[in-house]
Amino acid sequence: MGDAGGHSHHHQHGFQPQLLSFGGVGHHHHLHQFTAQPQPPAASHTRGRGGGGEIVPATTTPRSRGGGGGGGGEIVAVQGGHIVRSTGRKDRHSKVCTARGPRDRRVRLSAHTAIQFYDVQDRLGYDRPSKAVDWLIKNAKDAIDKLDVLPAWQPTAGGAGAGNAAAPPSSSTHPDSAENSDDQAQAITVAHTAFDFAGGGSGGTSFLPPSLDSDAIADTIKSFFPMGGTAGGEASSSTTAAQSSAMGFQSYTPDLLSRTGSQSQELRLSLQSLPDPMFHHQQHRHGGGGGGGNGTTQQALFSGAANYSFGGGAMWATEQQAQNQRMLPWNVPDPGGGGGAAYLFNVSQQAAHMQAAAAALGGHQSQFFFQRGPLQSSNQPSERGWPETVEADNQMSHHQGGLSPSVSAAIGFAAPGIGFSGFRLPARIQGDEEHNGGGGGNGDKPPPPSSVSSASHH
């Protein structure tokens, strides 16, 4: 069993580093066999035949290390030393305990040395290589005795020695197994991270390795989806990032998600809602001569908790045609007494006759800009109740713009001194712009209440 042909030596050599790597020293000594090849035959011969009492001390010292190198193998005492019987599946061959750690009983020789060795074996007439090695060691005994003797292991008793030899493998194997388990646990942790934001807030931090900074994740999400409010600046943990974003899509309505199947073709801008539920537009106060030139200005705020999505895909045009939406002129009462003109709008790509009229805002012309790209409001319920407010506030308006009951675009506002260029959306506006002077003026009337109420039901 200790002898094998040259082919088997070469075949099993590939598995040897895997077993020897557990001990930490076996791999190094395996390389040592290539540099000093005459020594391994002597070691294997000594273990195999159990002779040569002077060689035994050289094999006894590192038994504790040899057990660890065996990868949990069984240590068996033999004449002249000990062998480690491997229990692994990759390397089924036993190893011998040496002063430099466990070594394979099979020795691989260089081509030139193998030719000479088999020539000696054939000339001696031996059928096994180990017999030829025994003959070589016996004839070289005088030269071997002149070599330095390696540190010897002194066993206290035969049974105790075997027990001590059997004990170290478990003690030396545990650190390796613990280290391997740590590596596996780390690999599992990285595998479970797979950017698991879908967990909401349940155990999100336990799966994040130190390399993934939760703040960096939150900043990255906010750069693509500027949520503002709670999502901006307060995301200090992965759970907060997971709750404030599910990649930022929970803020959109389900019908919007169904329309936006192709994410790469659309640009979504999520605008955080502001406290004021109305959309104000800065304007001049309409009043008498003492009203002043600039008048009272109001902030331009986006309505409600709506996140507006801007997209330019043609897919939206076909899917939004089923919605009937209206554009209504609406005047917001000015706290200072004047009426402020603003527009409540909802957008669709409904292809029909597109008409609208421009309204004058405080003696300045309102500019309307249109381009490709719909503006979809995701806050539909809040706008359905607004026509009643529009009807009540129309009495306070000095100037209004009458618009067609059915339009397919939203209007962008521009007034001198505001610098707000407006939203650029597809539409056609037909009509004349009117200029109003001083304190009074005429304006087109808004759509009748019947059309207003019907718009709220779509």
Curated annotation (Swiss-Prot):
Pfam families linked to this entry: TCP
Gene encoding the protein: PCF5
Molecular function via GO: DNA-binding transcription factor activity; sequence-specific DNA binding
Quaternary structure annotation from Swiss-Prot or TrEMBL: Forms homodimers and heterodimers.
Keywords noted in UniProt: Activator, Developmental protein, DNA-binding, Nucleus, Transcription, Transcription regulation
Domain of life of the source: Eukaryota
Domain TCP: 89-147
Organism: Oryza sativa subsp. japonica (Rice)
Gene Ontology cellular-component annotations: nucleus
Ranges where the record places region Disordered: 1-103, 159-182, 278-299, 424-458
Function comment: Transcription activator. Binds the promoter core sequence 5'-GGNCC-3'.
Cellular localisation: Nucleus
Bias kind Gly residues: ranges: 65-74
InterPro entries (alphabetical): TF_TCP_subgr (IPR017887), Transcription_factor_TCP (IPR005333)
Protein name, as recorded: Transcription factor PCF5
